[in-house]
């Protein structure tokens, strides 16, 4: 008599293959984290070979015939739990993404992007776009080729890429979304700049010692709910979050002479991390044990950074502690002056340091350029000029060098084309969640009482714990009772900045 039934044996085999795939993916993630943080400068070339080998193992684990047979057997199996069925669905989708790509090209791309991030970091530091351009051209070439392998029924290449980050939001959907933002926010931004009151923020820039910035960052991360027993904070060229599983989530920040840059980077990345730390124990280290989508992920990071972190109520119980850390810099700056300063609208060059009102225009610029790169074969060499022209057109500023222009983001070096729109979508998702939560709890009073945990627990219960069991549209519908509606985002920005800039009485 066999020890296991045939069905039980299939479950065991499927679990074994899935565990192997997730273990390899986790190892690659760990190498990528190390590459961006602690690895020595010369490590990149050889480490990229290791990542290439691991990516080949991952490719085999997901695409092998045995895995295919097991997944096909499970497709439509009514005895599977919700989580099991979701993992089968996720692995089938992963196979659809990977199987059309030849394994040697898949591994070569993994090696390329592992090297590309180091090349980008050096080029940014040296303000030298030409040093990065050939590598970027290769990354774009691979991504277009891969999208071509995966495209079905004449689907456009950029739509294939967009689907990787936010399913169901094609160029057609995003063109409509950004059209609403452009129509409503460009004239409102102009009104704020021309008619709004003056806000002083010079005290945010100056001599803020790094060790004190780190102390403040660690305090704020913990205050909003980042668990240092299950996470670490490090320094990198570009702040990011890495998730290994719900007992190991890592964030980074960077330090400049503008204290609010690091401060809000930490709260933003803590928002990402809180999402991953909140994934259910039954889901972590499985294919669905991660955020529902990049848009939903950004909704959480930007919810913590902006809706919570830039509100006056958030600072009421803790501002005196911040002043005590920086008595010379902030001792004579009262709470209202501080809150106004960290919300000041200043159309600038750097996306990660943009105010909420102009932020979506930074994303729009990247979206338009990505469409041109992927759909119109834009020459990479023309990127710095095009970037500068668009910044001048939309925000009235022009970068003086590539580091504050086209080289400022890490995403393209990683091959993450189609990611940027999720930032603006995330802001819009977050605003819709905010208006719903205001109806069911006294949001501001909770923040004034230092009860960020109540808000965090609500998000964990209704969003975080589910991982990828639901997509972003379903989450919004289940939580708010409505389909996605970008008008909440426009309303949030207009209400907030009309109040902040004294425009309420001006119509």
What is the role of each PLM region?
Residues 1-8, 12:
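Single conserved hydrophobic/aromatic residue that forms the stacking wall/gate
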Residues 10, 26, 42, 46, ...:
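C-terminal, non-catalytic "cap/extension" segments appended to globular domains
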Residues 13-16, 20-23, 46-56, 60, ...:
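Charged, amphipathic alpha-helical oligomerization/scaffolding segments
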Residues 24-86:
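Charged, amphipathic alpha-helical segments characteristic of ABC-type P-loop ATPases involved
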Residues 68-114:
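A contiguous, low-structure linker/loop signature
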Residues 109-261:
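Contiguous, non-catalytic segments that form substrate-binding/exosite surfaces or channel walls
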Residues 263-280, 298-302:
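Active-site recognition of the HExxH zinc-binding catalytic motif
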Residues 290-330:
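Post-HExxH zinc-binding segment in Zn-dependent metallohydrolases
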């Amino acid at each position: 008599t066999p020890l296991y039934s045939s069905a039980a044996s299939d479950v065991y085999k499927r679990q074994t293959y899935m565990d192997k795939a997730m273990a390899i993916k986790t190892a690659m993630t760990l190498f990528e984290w190390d590459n961006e943080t602690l690895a020595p400068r010369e490590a990149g070339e050889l480490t990229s070979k290791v990542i290439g080998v691991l990516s080949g193992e991952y490719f085999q684990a997901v695409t092998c015939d045995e895995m295919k047979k097991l997944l096909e057997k499970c497709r439509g199996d009514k005895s599977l739990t919700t989580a099991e069925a979701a993992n089968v669905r996720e692995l089938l989708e992963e196979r659809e993404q990977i199987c059309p790509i030849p394994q040697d090209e898949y591994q070569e791309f993994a090696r390329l992007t592992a090297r590309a991030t180091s090349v980008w970091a050096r080029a940014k530091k040296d303000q030298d776009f030409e040093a990065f351009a050939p590598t970027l051209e290769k990354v774009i070439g691979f991504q277009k080729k891969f999208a071509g392998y995966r495209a079905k029924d004449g689907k456009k290449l950029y739509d294939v890429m967009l689907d990787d980050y936010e399913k169901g939001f094609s160029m057609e959907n995003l063109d409509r979304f950004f059209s609403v933002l452009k129509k409503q926010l460009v004239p409102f931004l102009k009104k704020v700049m021309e008619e709004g009151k003056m806000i002083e923020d010079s005290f945010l820039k100056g001599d803020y010692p790094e060790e004190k910035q780190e102390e403040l960052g660690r305090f704020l991360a913990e205050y909003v709910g980042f668990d240092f027993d299950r996470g670490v904070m490090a320094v990198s060229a570009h702040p990011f979050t890495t998730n290994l599983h719900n007992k190991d989530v890592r964030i980074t920040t960077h330090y400049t002479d503008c204290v609010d840059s690091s401060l809000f980077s930490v709260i933003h990345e803590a928002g990402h991390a809180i999402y991953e730390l909140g994934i259910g124990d039954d889901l972590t280290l499985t294919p669905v044990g991660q955020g529902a989508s990049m848009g939903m992920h950004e909704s959480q990071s930007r919810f913590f950074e902006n809706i919570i972190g830039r509100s006056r109520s958030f600072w009421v119980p803790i501002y005196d502690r911040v002043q005590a850390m920086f008595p010379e810099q902030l001792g004579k700056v009262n709470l209202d002056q501080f809150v106004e300063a960290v919300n000041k609208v200043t159309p600038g060059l750097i996306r990660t340091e943009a105010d909420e009102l102009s932020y979506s225009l930074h994303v729009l610029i990247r979206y338009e350029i990505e469409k041109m790169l992927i759909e119109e074969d834009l020459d990479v060499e023309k990127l710095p000029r095009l970037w500068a022209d668009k910044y001048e057109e939309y925000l009235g500023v022009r970068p003086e060098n590539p580091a504050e222009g086209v080289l400022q983001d890490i995403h393209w070096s990683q091959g993450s084309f189609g990611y940027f729109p999720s930032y603006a979508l995330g802001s819009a998702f977050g605003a819709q969640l905010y208006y719903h939560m205001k109806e069911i709890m006294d949001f501001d009073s909770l923040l004034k009482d230092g009860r960020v945990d109540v808000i965090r627990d609500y998000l964990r219960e209704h969003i975080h714990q589910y991982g990828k069991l639901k997509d972003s549209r379903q989450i919004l519908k289940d939580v708010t009772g409505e389909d996605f509606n970008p008008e909440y985002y426009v309303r949030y920005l207009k209400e907030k900045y009309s109040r902040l800039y004294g425009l309420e009485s001006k119509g």
